[in-house]
Amino acid sequence: MWLTRKRKAEARDELIKILDLTKTLVDRSEESCFDGMSPAEISMDLSIAIDALRAGDSFDSEQLKVHFAPTGILQEVAMMSGWADEYLRISELFDELIAAGA
């Protein structure tokens, strides 16, 4: 059980790093005419999740899954702002961490 908690804590720490990186990229991004949300709104959602994770609280993983989904809002912003390849790497790590119970 201790090991499971340790792994979960490590996964949460990695998820925080991934979300921080994503937030940094989003903060430098341009708005897409195809998105329903601005980069500032996406950044706010990421900040809320990061703060919750750091506090050890629950967060809206379903909302983040929608943001990170293929052809979702983050991919659109990434494509419009020149970080599509990095988005693919980030989203793969995000999916792995969420599946691990982060």
Would you name each region that the model predicts?
Residues 13-16, 20, 40, 44-47, ...:
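Generic structural signal for well-ordered, non-transmembrane alpha-helical segments
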Residues 23-72:
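Amphipathic alpha-helical interaction modules
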Residues 1-39, 94-101:
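Short terminal alpha-helical segments
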Residues 3-11, 46, 51-62, 79-90:
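Short, Lys/Arg-enriched charge-dense amphipathic segments
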